Amino acid sequence: MSGNKRGSRASCPHRGAECLLPWAALNLQGFQLLLLHPSATAMMDVSELGESARYLRQGYQEMTKVHTIPWDGKKRVWVPDEQDAYVEAEVKSEATGGRVTVETKDQKVLMVREAELQPMNPPRFDLLEDMAMMTHLNEASVLHNLRQRYARWMIYTYSGLFCVTINPYKWLPVYTASVVAAYKGKRRSDSPPHIYAVADNAYNDMLRNRDNQSMLITGESGAGKTVNTKRVIQYFAIVAALGDGPGKKAQFLATKTGGTLEDQIIEANPAMEAFGNAKTLRNDNSSRFGKFIRIHFGPSGKLASADIDSYLLEKSRVIFQLPGERSYHVYYQILSGRKPELQDMLLLSMNPYDYHFCSQGVITVDNMNDGEELIATDHAMDILGFSVDEKCACYKIVGALLHFGNMKFKQKQREEQAEADGTESADKAAYLMGVSSGDLLKGLLHPRVRVGNEYVTKGQSVEQVVFAVGALAKATYDRLFRWLVSRINQTLDTKLPRQFFIGVLDIAGFEIFEFNSFEQLCINFTNEKLQQFFNQHMFVLEQEEYKREGIDWVFIDFGLDLQPCIDLIEKPLGILSILEEECMFPKASDASFRAKLYDNHAGKSPNFQQPRPDKKRKYQAHFEVVHYAGVVPYSIVGWLEKNKDPLNETVVPIFQKSQNRLLATLYENYAGSCSTEPPKSGVKEKRKKAASFQTVSQLHKENLNKLMTNLRATQPHFVRCIVPNENKTPGVMDAFLVLHQLRCNGVLEGIRICRQGFPNRLLYTDFRQRYRILNPSAIPDDTFMDSRKATEKLLGSLDLDHTQYQFGHTKVFFKAGLLGVLEELRDQRLAKVLTLLQARSRGRLMRLEYQRLLGGRDALFTIQWNIRAFNAVKNWSWMKLFFKMKPLLRSAQAEEELAALRAELRGLRGALAAAEAKRQELEETHVSITQEKNDLALQLQAEQDNLADAEERCHLLIKSKVQLEGKVKELSERLEDEEEVNADLAARRRKLEDECTELKKDIDDLELTLAKAEKEKQATENKVKNLTEEMAALDESVARLTKEKKALQEAHQQALGDLQAEEDRVSALTKAKLRLEQQVEDLECSLEQEKKLRMDTERAKRKLEGDLKLTQESVADAAQDKQQLEEKLKKKDSELSQLSLRVEDEQLLGAQMQKKIKELQARAEELEEELEAERAARARVEKQRAEAARELEELSERLEEAGGASAGQREGCRKREAELGRLRRELEEAALRHEATVAALRRKQAEGAAELGEQVDSLQRVRQKLEKEKSELRMEVDDLAANVETLTRAKASAEKLCRTYEDQLSEAKIKVEELQRQLADASTQRGRLQTESGELSRLLEEKECLISQLSRGKALAAQSLEELRRQLEEESKAKSALAHAVQALRHDCDLLREQHEEEAEAQAELQRLLSKANAEVAQWRSKYEADAIQRTEELEEAKKKLALRLQEAEEGVEAANAKCSSLEKAKLRLQTESEDVTLELERATSAAAALDKKQRHLERALEERRRQEEEMQRELEAAQRESRGLGTELFRLRHGHEEALEALETLKRENKNLQEEISDLTDQVSLSGKSIQELEKTKKALEGEKSEIQAALEEAEGALELEETKTLRIQLELSQVKAEVDRKLAEKDEECANLRRNHQRAVESLQASLDAETRARNEALRLKKKMEGDLNDLELQLGHATRQATEAQAATRLMQAQLKEEQAGRDEEQRLAAELHEQAQALERRASLLAAELEELRAALEQGERSRRLAEQELLEATERLNLLHSQNTGLLNQKKKLEADLAQLSGEVEEAAQERREAEEKAKKAITDAAMMAEELKKEQDTSAHLERMKKTLEQTVRELQARLEEAEQAALRGGKKQVQKLEAKVRELEAELDAEQKKHAEALKGVRKHERRVKELAYQAEEDRKNLARMQDLVDKLQSKVKSYKRQFEEAEQQANTNLAKYRKAQHELDDAEERADMAETQANKLRARTRDALGPKHKE
């Protein structure tokens, strides 16, 4: 007995869900267990593990040896090492200069920086099972601990809250049944680290917390995730398996196979691994798909069911493998030959190299026996309940794919068409697939393609056929794998009650290969999201909960945010988004995809890099992504095709009709672009989008988002798998590789937060309930105490370290390990209580046993006394006599009585026999009569019951028949409406598809053009920037030269004033005249050089334009014509007049061409009418031909029935049939020719229009260039004329001065002495005048800058005010539209308004706070409202499948009824769990209080945000008022400075022109907005029609479906409205912020300008008169040039328009007209032939008149149907007209956008030309400045020489030298003339510089306006494109709904027929029953 007790004690721990139950709820068995087990084991006994012990925990001796190693804590450190990462070392000397001398274990002495040292842990911390217990936590210590444990094959180690496992690359005996039993129910701290411990912890948390759990097993590829996943599933299957009893019966009924549920869960892995695992370079058994396995448990924790979700199978591996890799295991298992019957069935050999699809890499795997694996796979499928047919079908598809890969094709000679190179493989594949080999090859080689409304057979090249074969193979294998998973789920779904689940995630690990493609990006993106989830859960949410609960905690940023990389991949304009966008464009390629990637991310995202050049790479990399696990180079080859995943839509219908039922099932739901039939009903798995729109990346993102949602709704448990080395060598650890994985996985950070934080927490109520037993006296029962106070009091009464826990608002938090201490104390307390209880119970039992023994003793005493008394008297003599006499006393009397009794007995026996015989006879009669009565009564009752039931059923059937007839009638009417709508929508869809294709092409062209314009604009901006910088440098040099020159001018003026009387001025002026003439000649030479430079520039520009136009059609002729025109227009102005004459002639010719064009258009319309008539005639002929064919068939049948006809009649029939065949062929040829003719006409018309457009563009460019050259030439002529006039005036004044100077020569001698004095004064005045001149020039420049700033400030202010006003109007419109939308919703308006305000005011500052609140709500709901979450998930799934469920209306009703019954069951189950709900309500109440508090905090924050917005609005209004005030002040200042601002009139006029252009653009934008509003109205109308259709369908589905659909639709509309509100509010906020910033900048600029204007006011007044003359001259010149330019532009524009109209259309229209005429004649000839043939047919028809009479009835019916079709066609035509109007409107908007784009291009080109001109002028000014510099130096030298000569002249004058004085005077006059000329030159140069400055500013402003216009055009194009996409989606949805309605109608019709048949049968049966009843009752009534 004691032995049994000990054994049972060891197997019943006191930890688990049972400990939570109160004592009163314990059953009898649990009570007896508590009595027998007084204590639980505190530590696992290693002996329980058997031979597995040494792989999990070292023995005592080994640990003692390790822990007692001598150690010096101050000197032992870790130092970095190049080989082992870190090595152990000893410090030899202290730090000197930041370096320390250390000695390693191998006697090496190193000098290491002190910062690189890491302290070692004492030896007693070696081989730690939990690395969070280390004293020194660093990389080296963690690596050392893992390395030591791995060397002893201990692969599992705890790292804080999660577990780290290292792949051993060998089998270890740590997964046996004894190990599973040893870990069952153990605490984590009691057992060695193991994956079983983590699984058991999750299982116990599920039972204890009543919450769903998940286990995330992550790591790189080859880290051992799959093996650990299998072990976890094995553990759950064994621990939570169903026991014996009723549950066993339920399990047997659920599984329906020989295998139990736990066996099936375990065997699901081998089946999926065979089809989904393969060998890679890093892993021999790599999972090439992801799976999330949910294991469901019942309320008691027993196994209930399971299901599997799979993610992203690597389909490309089916047809391609890298060297060193292998395809999926199932191929090689089948080819292993272990089951020879498979080879025979699949027609396969045993050599994998015979099959291309599976032999591109290796074919074997070390340590893997493919034959044994095949047996395991087959056994697993048997356990999972696969039938033999299902297995054979599965194997056949795999074998067919092998044959599929061996199909070979070759190119036909002299053709691009491919043909089959042998059909053996195709025949085998078709045989296994159950299809026709000929149809399969025909579908591959000649697929049918849909062109408009018809199908055309298309030829394929060899490459296209090979690609189609590969795509079909990949799609078939992928669908086979998904079917396998769904089939396994079907088996594992046992329908047992389930309450919780544990999800196990096994996803493909992070991969970095030499060749990384689209699959690697998806896999690595998934791992990136999972790592971010780990970081968020471990670090961010953990610390946020501390803050939320009020824990004293400082937030630690661990720097592990992976969101930038995730945003790079999945956000809008991310990698996947760009990939999806490219997949929508038909002309997209890998190159365009790569270009978009670099345009959007190169240099903008730190995680996106260009690939580094590496010669070792075998494959090209196009970009690199910085992932958390490393930098991965990706190759984008084939990404577009992989993402679109197209299929040959001719072969798919062949598969759908396959004899192989499994293959037909796989493609049952496929609906491509060529499919016309709706998908079959009754299938649960539906596609959410059409096949052409559902890309692989979209599907992967949706599945990944679902997975992340499921994970967030669970409590996660993390297991980190580590790859020890790249070579898969057991026992070898690459330190750097392991360190890299530890850093990426956040292992150190997880240990750190586990040590510093509070990883364990409990609600106060839970803690009080569980641990009150530790000190019951602390919480008395007779008084009420709050749970928190009770917890504080209880913990305070215990002997614990009070720093190890903290109290939050709702929970108590514990440091790591403290909860384990409390559990041990609780176990001890429970052991003590149970010991006392056992003692009392055993005493009671022993006392009862003692009382029983006492009663037995008394009974024994009584028996013993009686026996002793008998023994005492038995030998007494009298007693012996008594014994002998007593039997003899009555013997005689007894004999007499016995004889009498015997006689009486004989008499009675005779009477009894007679009575018995009579009684038996009567009883038999009675029984027979009674039986007959009962039989008749029962028969009567049965007949009456049958009659009543039959009548009742008859009534019910009649009622149901009436109802169904009404329903059918209603559905028939609705079907007719739907068919009409469907036909209309189909026509509209086809029309829109064509229009959309054209619009897409136009949009592509626009995008290319806009991109080119953007590049040109950027180049122009760069040029303008460079020119601005050069202008600034020139300004500085000119200012410096001006100052120096002015100083020289002052000196020379003084000198000239002193030498006025010199006679030599005449000769000096003559020399000056000659010099000026020479300068004129120099200027003419420079002008010629500038012309040459300009011609070179023009030639370069023409070359660039030619390069740009090479990509367009017919550009060579246009370029040649343009070049010829440019050469002609460059010669002289006289040629312009000749060109004008030619233009007039061309105008006349253009008018004539216009007339001809109109005539040709009229002729084209006539031809179109003739074509329509021809079509009608063709239709009539076709109809007559069909009738004739039908009549001929009837005649032939009758003739055969009559018994044979004559040879002549048969010959006539054959002739008629031949004639009919010929007629049919000719009709088809005529139709094809007609269509080709129409297409050619349209194509030629489009080409002509395009050529005309190109000619117009070229002529416009020529006109612009001519205008520019003309204006330049006129300016040059004016300049030359001005120079000539100046020279003439100078010559006249020089002659006059000669006479004057001759008179004054006598006075010169007297003034020589005075000149000497004045020369000294001049030197002093020169400095003063020089400073004044510099100051004046500076003031002048400041004035000009202020003027330009004021003008720009005004423009900016006006623009900002206008933009603000427009945005306010748009915002008010948007608000009114939103209010209308909110009123239309059937939802609570107040709730929607609150959501609107919350979403509107939750800006960037509160976004993080709101996300935290959402996370809190999700966490609370996931913990305490599991059932509600489950129902929410079901509603979400129902919401997503709503559109697809419309195809299964009746099935949906049944599903809804089933759902109602399940809800009723759930309601009953919830009622039984009222106690748990009460507890959860208490928790929820506390949680709600916390959430209310958080909500109040959020409301306060939102109120603060709202207040800030109001303040900002008030500031904006104040700024606007200030702006208006500043505008008034600016106007006043300008009024005061009108004379100073006259120079800006030209700028104002140009600004006015620009404003007019802006207003025009604004009007165009408003028109576009109106058109967009009209499109919105159309969209709303379509949405209204859609909602009406949906409402009608929902009424047919029933009340429950109606309510559910309304709820889901409202939720969808709410989410859409919410998203729209978010987007609009974000746009408004951004616009407001931009306006605020622009306004602030404008105000600051105006303020600065105002201050500068105030300072410069006085200086401007002084300079006003001086500037007046210059400004007037500039204004006159500019006005003259502007008028000339305007006139030239008008003339050139008129000329270009006329040339465009005449030159483009003349030849083309004539050619088209001729072709149309010829085609019309040909059609007429064909019509005459057809008419003759029709006459022959009529003759033949007259012979068959009798047959036609029999078909007249059918013809009448056909006529009625034709009338019906005619009415439908009328409706279609009306709808077509409406759609054409809509499309015309869209086309108009696109044309407007294109026109605006062209205008922007012209402006950009004009800006480029102006910039080039500015560059030339600047170069000229630079040359002039250089010349002036040289002249300056020459003049300085001359001045010095003049001074020397003047001194000599003075001496000579003193001596009386007259000749010397004359020479000096001549020299002075010469210098004076040169100075005047230089002054004029400088003035002209200064004017030119100022003009260029103004021109540069104008160009900059114009470039900015062009950029804004381009941005607006791009926005308009994007909006139009989005509209087109939305309309296309709407039409597709409408078409799908129409197909659904048609299917419903057919189903309802079928049900009606069935009901009618059942009603007829029931009525017949009822009549029979009535007759039988009357027949049975009739005789009885007569009796």
Curated annotation (Swiss-Prot):
Q: Where is this region: Actin-binding?
A: 704-726, 806-820
Positions annotated to bind ATP? 219-226
A GO term for molecular function:
actin filament binding
Q: Where is the composition biased (Basic and acidic residues)?
A: 1972-1983
Per UniProt, residues of the Myosin motor domain are 126-827
Subunit structure, interactors included: Muscle myosin is a hexameric protein that consists of 2 heavy chain subunits (MHC), 2 alkali light chain subunits (MLC) and 2 regulatory light chain subunits (MLC-2).
Protein name, as recorded = Myosin-7B
**Which source organism does the UniProt entry give?**
Homo sapiens (Human)
Taxonomy, top ranks, is:
Eukaryota, Metazoa, Chordata, Craniata, Vertebrata
